[in-house]
């Protein structure tokens, strides 16, 4: 009977997968929506820390992680954070800390004015240099 499992009388073969450990209460998590079904969770597995972005479901009063989601190691998380600004720009989103349209226009006008002043100064300096070379 090689390769077959022998079941003693009274024993039942279990077709269920072994239960996984419930999410511990000390893991940090942040809800992405009002129902808390989408979360960012920090965890550690085999000595490696992960940031999970995952959908959860409720079963028997407990919120359990679902299949939909992704686990990022620390390097992947850092890269995602670097890309967020580019994604925001592509979506046309404005950061709340950024300047308003009026402030941007004012800065552009000031920069243009400074550029004109700089050009005028350079022109005057060139004219003085030309005048001094004529005198010699």
Swiss-Prot record:
Pfam families: PC4
Compositional bias ranges of the Basic and acidic residues kind: 18-30, 121-136
Keyword presence, Ion transport: no
Functional note: General coactivator that functions cooperatively with TAFs and mediates functional interactions between upstream activators and the general transcriptional machinery. Binds single-stranded DNA.
Top-level taxonomy: Eukaryota, Fungi, Dikarya, Ascomycota, Taphrinomycotina
Principal localisation: nucleus
SS bonds (residue pairs): none
Annotated localization: Nucleus
GO molecular function: double-stranded DNA binding; single-stranded DNA binding; transcription coactivator activity
Name used for this protein in its record: Putative RNA polymerase II transcriptional coactivator
GO CC terms in record: nucleus; transcription regulator complex
GO biological process, one term: positive regulation of RNA polymerase II transcription preinitiation complex assembly
Record InterPro entries: PC4_C, ssDNA-bd_transcriptional_reg, Sub1/Tcp4-like
Family: Belongs to the transcriptional coactivator PC4 family.
Keyword line: Activator, DNA-binding, Nucleus, Phosphoprotein, Transcription, Transcription regulation
Region (Disordered) location: 1-30, 92-136
């Amino acid at each position: 009977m090689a390769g077959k499992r022998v079941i003693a009388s009274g024993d039942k073969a279990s077709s269920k997968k072994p239960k996984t450990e419930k999410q511990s209460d000390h893991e940090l998590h942040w809800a992405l929506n009002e129902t808390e079904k989408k979360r960012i969770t920090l965890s550690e597995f085999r000595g490696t820390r992960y940031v999970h972005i995952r959908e959860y479901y409720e079963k028997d009063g407990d919120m359990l992680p679902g299949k939909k989601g992704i686990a990022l190691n620390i390097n992947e998380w850092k890269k995602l954070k670097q890309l967020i600004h580019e994604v925001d720009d592509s979506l046309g989103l404005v950061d709340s800390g950024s300047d308003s349209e009026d402030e941007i226009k004012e800065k552009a006008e000031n920069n243009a004015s400074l550029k004109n002043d700089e050009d005028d100064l350079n022109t005057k300096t060139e004219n003085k240099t030309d005048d001094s070379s004529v005198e010699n």
